[in-house]
A protein has these predicted regions:
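Extreme N-termini of proteins with methionine-enriched Sec-type signal peptides or N-terminal signal-anchor
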Residues: 1-2, 19
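Sec-dependent signal peptide recognition
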Residues: 2-8
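Residue-level marker of positions within ordered structural domains that often coincide
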Residues: 6, 15, 57
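A periodicity- and composition-biased signal for non-globular, repetitive helical segments
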Residues: 8-9, 98
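Low-complexity, Pro/Thr/Ser/Gly/Ala-rich linker/spacer regions in secreted
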Residues: 20-24
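Active-site mouth of glycoside hydrolases
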Residues: 25-185
Length: 185
């Protein structure tokens, strides 16, 4: 039970990542008050966000860029430019753990993780806040078939991933490595 609570707390702590670039360290953080309302740390006013769920580093969006022969970083550059131009101040992603982990939950340093780092860096440059769900617990295929990756989530069904001792150990290893990961940008 303590492991589950620790895992939940870790995930919640990662939920809202303050998008601060190196030039601007004074961007306020967000906290949740006693009534469950997100507030800015500097003004105590309610924090509200308008954003997009965007998945180019992973799954079908990643593959689609490959099918079309489009440079993925150039696509991220263009898309983030338009997010900012449209006044979006938030970005959300479910990280496809099946694409950045192995069967034991080790974090894989691969193109998917590198593109996620790049995307986060570009969003931070534009002052766009980032909301991360650390894992998906589903495949990377939609609308196509799932692609085999060797990620731990593929070894357990969606319910067992939350109750099987080996699945929980793999998740703990993955989350710990993800939290310790340093963005290469």
């Amino acid at each position: 039970m303590k492991r589950h609570i620790l895992l939940l707390i870790t995930c919640l702590l990662m939920a809202v990542v303050p998008a601060q670039n190196k030039a601007s360290k004074s961007i306020p953080t967000v906290y949740v008050d006693g009534n469950g309302i997100m507030r800015w740390s500097d003004t105590r006013k309610e924090a509200s966000f308008f954003g997009v769920n965007y998945t180019l580093p992973f799954a079908h969006a990643y593959r689609a860029m490959g099918y079309l022969g489009i440079d993925r970083k150039a696509a991220i550059d263009r898309d983030v430019y338009h997010f900012a131009r449209l006044g979006l101040n938030a970005y959300r992603i479910h990280i496809w753990d099946v694409e950045i982990s192995d069967g034991e939950g080790n974090l894989l340093e691969n193109e998917h993780l590198e593109l996620l780092d790049y995307l986060i860096f570009k969003l931070q440059e534009r002052g766009i806040r980032i909301v991360i769900t650390a894992q998906t617990n589903f495949g990377n295929g939609y609308p196509e078939r799932n692609q085999p990756t060797g990620g731990f989530s593929y070894d357990y069904d969606k319910c067992a991933v939350h109750s099987d001792a080996e699945a929980i150990a793999a998740q703990e290893k993955y989350i710990a490595a993800l939290v310790r990961h340093v963005n290469s940008y």
